[in-house]
Amino acid sequence: MMTCVLFLLAAVSAAGAAEPFKAQYTPDVAARPQVRGAMLSQYTVGDDDFRTLKEWGATVVRYQMYPVGERWKGKTSDTDGFAAWLDWKLGVLKGEALPLARTHGIQLVVDMHVPPGGRGGSGMKMLDDPVWADFFVDCWRKIATRLRGERGIYAYDLINEPTQFGKPKVCDYLEIQCRAAAAIREIDGTTPVIVSCRNDVAWCAPSAFRWMKPIDLVNIYYQFHMYEPFDYTHQKVLPLFKDTVAAYPDAAKGWDAEGLRRIVAPVREFERRYGARIFVGEFSAVAYAKGCDKWIADVGAMLNEYGWDWCYHAFREWPGWSVEHVVTEGDSAATAKFATSNDNPRMRALLSVLKGN
């Protein structure tokens, strides 16, 4: 059985000096160019969706997977039901999404968007319950087995925004991902596996990389989400910011391109220290936020400069994130009204960075 080591390994060189741990990548993965794209709602798998994304310049999509709809209601907290949903969902992925993605030259990141067992207790049930922990690992064994050898799979994204509060009873957010990654490697030795930082603030914020540890397996990517400054990107979206009105840039607050670099500095340091590849699974600012087009442009340009893979949040999901919509009235998630648009400042900003600018 393959095991996974989280702590820093000290290799010994021929001279006897300790060498720092470095992430290992197979030559084909090490040679990969940067990919750019968007989060794809699991409801959005039509030919027009992939064609549009390709026209925009996307080369990857982050494909959400979680039980939704009347048929699968409540199955997140039922192992048999979750397993049945996963079998069905993998059929949809292989039979519909992957063929369309291949047709349009787009690769898929397979995203476990909601953890089996749901959230609660220490943050995720599987962190406190060994049955759910084992089940989560078994789910990834199933996914790797069903998708092994399928052309067009860019990576396996183990958990979306893993939440943990306090000390779990079974394993922590990183240990459970380590176990799943090792299980995948027993089946598939090379497809990259994406490990996420802890979702302790701002939906997997860059600051969480201060506590991230590298994993001693080949082809591991490390993920954060970029919703910073959080009170700007989520103003009047979350109850915490129900009265917030903020603009970007804001020199007085240090909210500008250089400020964004300071925010992601922990990730940059991790990348340099361990030679790690970075995946930015989501970034966005709500459509009614003043200056959000400039924020998209600055974040995208920074990610392109650093060569980090990224997916914008989101494509054809909620209009507040969609660049195919504009706000016609209102200034909050509760009051905003939207109209479709095929040309607006936010769209132009995203299309520019999708093309590498």
Feature locations, PLM:
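Bacterial N-terminal signal peptides that target proteins for export
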Residues: M1-V5
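Extracellular glycoside hydrolase catalytic/binding regions
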Residues: P20-F21, V35, Q42, D138-R141, ...
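Conserved beta-strand positions in the central sheet of alpha/beta enzyme cores
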Residues: M39, V60-R62, V109, D157, ...
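Short, solvent-exposed turn/loop segments enriched in Gly/Ser/Thr/Pro and often Arg
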Residues: Q64-P67, H113-G117, I159, C197-N199, ...
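Active-site-adjacent "subsite" loops/lids of carbohydrate-active enzymes
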Residues: G120-K142
